[in-house]
Each structure stands twice: as structure tokens, then as C-alpha cells.
Amino acid sequence: MKIGLLVLRGDPVEGPSVVDLSSYIPPSRHQFETRYISKSEAEAGIDRICKDEFDMCLNYMTVESCDDVSTVAAITRYLEAKDITLLNSPCLTHITDAGEETRRFRIPIKAHELNLEDLRGKKWLTLAMDMGREAMSFSPGQFTSSMCLDQEDLHSTSTDFTWVTEDPLKSMLRSMALDVLKASSGGFVCVEASLQAQADSMYLEGLLCTPRAFYREKHSTYEDVVIEQEFPGGHLAFLDMLITSKQIRSGQDHARNQHLAGVYDSFAPRYHAARANTGLSRMQEDMSRDYDFSGTVLDLACGNGEFGATLHENGVSAKVTGIDVSEGMTRSSYIQDHYERPLLIGPMDELIMGMPEFDHVSVTAIHEDLSDAYIEDMKKRNGELCSNFNHISTLEEFGVPNGWQQVLMQRFPLYENPNLGETVYGFAIRFERA
């Protein structure tokens, strides 16, 4: 994708942006170009950006003064009116009783809920992001010396912070970040919070800050550290999730998903015979014997349910839940006999984020080493909406998440493609908790 990085500037020429996504994301995945928006000619600058035909944009317009709050809010509204797709919205404002536009908001707390004396003067940052149609928040960080980005109180880019591990403060901060994310419709947000008092009332005061993720000096900010440590796949997976979530929420993949479901509905009567005696069936047999799948299993792209049947036939005591885009594929005796109810029908990337925890997650037949000829043949046979990809570079870039170990990574012949007369290869991969 071609992604624009939008930075607000005063009229004088200033130095380069401190944000550098190309340090984290390979150019083979996405291309980034920085566009500076002048405060005095913002609308003209945005009109020029529209001609650059970016697929999406990241909004890094930093508020540096009280006047900038209204300026950035107005520019953001103009961006949205021009149908520029923004991956984040760092400017959530509301009007105070005094008629001022502000980014600050308050959450009342009761004195007995927190040890107030220990928390006075402290400041915390919490990152939150969209995950499909759901949302998640990261571990909050408490700074030893903190300043915030609006220069009323500038927070430093230093990683000199400690993790907030104790409740109820941790839960309060994460809940606040999720509330701000929901209100901003923002893709991802970073919220700075502090403890404040007014008369007899105590409250957490929150400030929506411009996220400092993807900084030029790698892992020099809270955001970059927490993404690297807590988000499997790191910054690349984080950005891809933001893009995917935006696409899901916009509904732009609806036609593709419906088309794909129809393709597999038509294939369903022939699937069992096509799968028999293939590398796929042998791989699933081997996996069910060689690794522990006991407990609860989430089977993504479960198809006709033969993996769940294979587990049970090999004596595995597992409750298997399935997700598949094709209702026709799931009308099988394997599903009836081996899968929990309800079975979920729909795109797995949309449904998975709302699922409870499972002991194991299985994803079948998506890690494929596909040739260009195969990809083009699938489009010719099933239409442009039936897209396929070679996933090898994605696997390599994903790596091994923190706290996990890769116990299996094996390339094997998946099946024979009769249309092209070639063998399609795939990868069997397994991660386990370290």
C-alpha cells in the first residue's frame, strides 16, 4: 500500500519528521511518503495530498499550543470530508462549560479506590488499538519524569518508565484508553493520564496525545516498546492490523467475502474427495499425533471439519470450535459429530477478535508457497475477487512472538494442482508458549 504520513508544520521550514515508518516496515510491504501540512494553508495542502492517491494516511499532526487544538481538529474534519482514509485520529476534542475546545477529559474516582498519596504527581501512558471490530489496550507505563506533547507539559521520548502492574489503577487506565479509542473512532490512540483534585473530588484526567509509534530512534518511546513487547509480530503486524481493522469497519471487503463464500459453497461437494490422500490430510494426521491438542481448540477456516474429526479419531480429548466463511463447507457429518455449537460463519479476521480464550488455535492450509501462475489461474477460474497470495515473506517477517517458541517449521507438498500440473507446497508451523 501507498501510505501518507501527515505532519503539521508552521510556516517556517523545519527539520525532518521524527517518525520513520520505513525503519520498521519493509518497502516490499508498504511504501511511505511524508506530507507536511502548513497551518496557514492547510486546506490547499490537503487538496494537493488528495491528488497523490494514497491508499491510507497516518495522522501525526502534533498539537504544540492551545491554538493548535482547534486547528488540528478543523484540519482533521477537512481531511475526513475529503474522503481521505485515516488510520488514526489523534484529535478528540469536546467543548467545556466555558466554551473552549479541549482534548482533556476527566473520570471521577473514589478516594478508597487508589492509594492517592503514592500516585500524586505521577503520569501514565496507555496505548489502545482497534482489532477488527473489537479493541484492545496495552499495558500502561508510568514515567519517572514525564512531559506531554502539547508543550504545556512535554513528555520526553525516553523509555525511562516502569510498567503499571497493580489493579485497580491498571484496569482504570486501560479502560480509559478504550473509552477514548471508541469516542475518537481512531484506529489507535495513546492517552496520557494523571491524578487531579478539585474541591472534594478526585479524578483521573486524560489527554489524547499524538501517538509516538514508529519513531526514527527505534524503541525510544513507550509506544514502540510496548508494541515490540506485547504485539505478536511487532510493528509490521501492528500496522497490518490497523489496516485490516479499517477495511473491516468500512465494509470494503464485504463483496470479496461474499464471493469467496460462494466459491467454496460450490466446491463443498467435491472437497472431501479432493482432500483425500493429500499432503494436507497427512500433515493434519501427523500434527494430531505429534503435538498436544487437548482442551479447547479454535479451528479457523475449518472447512468441512476434517481436522476436528482427525483429532478425535486419534484419541485427543478436545472441544473444537470452528469458523469458516462458507456455510456450504460446514454442512458435513464431520462438523455435526465433532464441533461445538454454535459454529460461526463469516470471515475469520472479523470474528476471531470477539472469541474467548482457547488452549489451541489451528489455521489450516493458508501458509502456501504459491506460484504466480497459480495465483493468476485462480483469478481466471473464480474471478478477481478470489485473491490468493504467496505467504512465505509474511511468515519470515512475522518471526517468533515474545514469550513463544517455534517448535515446527516444515515445508511439504500440500496437494497437486490438476489445472496446472504442478505441486502446491505449504508450510506446517507450530508455536508453543516458551
Swiss-Prot record:
<keyword id="KW-0949">S-adenosyl-L-methionine</keyword>
<dbReference type="InterPro" id="IPR029063">
    <property type="entry name" value="SAM-dependent_MTases_sf"/>
</dbReference>
<protein>
    <recommendedName>
        <fullName>Putative methyltransferase cpaM</fullName>
        <ecNumber>2.1.1.-</ecNumber>
    </recommendedName>
</protein>
<keyword id="KW-0808">Transferase</keyword>
<dbReference type="Pfam" id="PF13649">
    <property type="entry name" value="Methyltransf_25"/>
</dbReference>
<dbReference type="GO" id="GO:0008168">
    <property type="term" value="F:methyltransferase activity"/>
</dbReference>
<dbReference type="GO" id="GO:0032259">
    <property type="term" value="P:methylation"/>
</dbReference>
<keyword id="KW-0489">Methyltransferase</keyword>
<comment type="function">
    <text>Putative methyltransferase; part of the gene cluster that mediates the biosynthesis of the fungal neurotoxin cyclopiazonic acid (CPA), a nanomolar inhibitor of Ca(2+)-ATPase with a unique pentacyclic indole tetramic acid scaffold. The hybrid two module polyketide synthase-nonribosomal peptide synthetase (PKS-NRPS) cpaS incorporates acetyl-CoA, malonyl-CoA, and tryptophan (Trp) and utilizes a C-terminal redox-incompetent reductase domain to make and release the tryptophan tetramic acid, cyclo-acetoacetyl-L-tryptophan (c-AATrp), as the first intermediate in the pathway.</text>
</comment>
<comment type="similarity">
    <text>Belongs to the methyltransferase superfamily.</text>
</comment>
<dbReference type="InterPro" id="IPR041698">
    <property type="entry name" value="Methyltransf_25"/>
</dbReference>
